[in-house]
């Protein structure tokens, strides 16, 4: 930790800071320099409340912390999964944007299995910008996704949008998904962590690596031990559908598996395919893809949904 001293820091500032460091970090080491103070040998989890207290002192400019100090669990966590074997290649999670009818979803699930998918998107709940848009089939679709798993043998990935949904999904789905809109929904993160289930967490548009890893830190702190980071992009209109630099930064700073969602920020299925290829080239461990037998008939997001045939070709080429 590096505490930057301002122009008007004086002996009183340093004395107050020394006292504060002793209160928050007993047994730590503090090296006072001309324009900064370096603090080491402290427990990272005690630092979150120290920072605002230190920055409130007259003469303190700002406090700089490394990712390992702010996100000790996320940075030290290992690539771990009892569902996927990452040693055998990239992982492809695919399925419709939302579950609609039993006939459509089961037909699609069978086709995705044949295409080489490793897991199924089982989207029962859909957070939408408009309150009038289709919000997902909800728990009425529980039997549908259960049948899909029985038929295909593939694990299920289901987005949660409310803390009350989680206990109902334990034992039904295999991986909880935290969507980009809810990356900062901290009560949802806590409850997902308490479930002990594997969690895939997307990065919110324009969120920093620090913010993304802090959200993963919530999941790990509250009980999840298997986390997948998923880069989602910064929205339609961005230079690239997925932020490739963010994928590279996540891979550099943590050993957690890093996936990409190439569809949601892509302007069409063709652009989504290109984004998928680019994400894998930058080292992504897997992809979360929207794929349908007939995308033009999809209830939601058909525009950037791949066909099963396109997905099969992608898996064959990039697995």
What role is predicted for each listed range?
Residues 90-107, 131-135, 157-159, 179-180, ...:
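Active-site mouth loops of central-metabolism enzymes
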Residues 195-294:
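Catalytic alpha/beta core domains of metabolic enzymes, predominantly
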Residues 121-139, 292-302:
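Glycine-rich, proline-tolerant flexible connector loops at the mouths of alpha/beta enzymes
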Residues 137, 154-162, 174-189, 197-209, ...:
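Catalytic beta/alpha-barrel core
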Residues 36-73:
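Autoinhibitory propeptides
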Residues 90-96, 118-122, 156-158, 176-178, ...:
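Hydrophobic faces of well-ordered beta-strands that scaffold small-molecule active sites
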Residues 65-93:
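N-terminal amphipathic alpha-helix/helix-capping segment at the start of soluble metabolic enzymes
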Residues 134-158, 192-198, 246-258, 304-319:
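Alpha-helix-loop-beta-strand connector modules within alpha/beta enzyme cores
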């Amino acid at each position: 930790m590096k505490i930057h001293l301002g122009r008007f820091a004086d002996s009183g500032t340093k004395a107050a800071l020394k006292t504060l460091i002793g209160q928050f970090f007993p047994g730590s080491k503090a090296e006072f320099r001309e324009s900064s103070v370096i603090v080491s040998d402290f427990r990272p989890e005690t630092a979150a409340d120290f920072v605002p207290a230190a920055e409130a002192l007259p003469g303190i400019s700002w406090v700089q912390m490394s990712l390992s100090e702010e996100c000790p669990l996320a940075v030290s966590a290992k690539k771990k999964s009892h569902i996927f074997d990452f040693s055998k290649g990239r992982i492809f999670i695919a399925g419709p944007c939302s579950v609609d009818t039993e006939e459509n979803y089961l037909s699609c699930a069978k086709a995705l299995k044949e295409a080489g998918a490793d897991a199924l998107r089982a989207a029962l709940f859909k957070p939408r910008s408009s309150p009038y848009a289709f919000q997902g089939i909800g728990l009425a679709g529980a039997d549908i996704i259960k049948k899909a798993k029985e038929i295909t043998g593939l694990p299920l990935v289901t987005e949660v949008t409310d803390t009350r949904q989680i206990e109902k999904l334990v034992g039904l789905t295999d991986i909880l998904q935290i969507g980009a809109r809810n990356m900062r929904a901290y009560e949802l993160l806590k409850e997902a962590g308490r479930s002990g289930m594997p969690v895939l967490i997307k990065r919110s548009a324009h969120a920093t690596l620090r913010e993304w890893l802090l959200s993963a830190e919530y999941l790990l702190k509250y009980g999840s031990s298997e986390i997948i980071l998923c880069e989602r992009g910064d929205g339609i209109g961005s230079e690239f559908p997925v932020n490739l630099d963010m994928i590279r930064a996540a891979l550099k700073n943590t050993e957690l598996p890093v996936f990409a969602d190439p569809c949601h920020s892509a302007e069409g299925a063709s652009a989504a395919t290109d984004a998928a290829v680019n994400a894998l080239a930058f080292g992504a461990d897997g992809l979360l893809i929207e794929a349908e037998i007939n995308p033009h008939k999809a209830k939601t997001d058909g525009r950037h949904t791949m066909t099963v045939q396109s997905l099969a070709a992608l898996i064959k080429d990039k697995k």
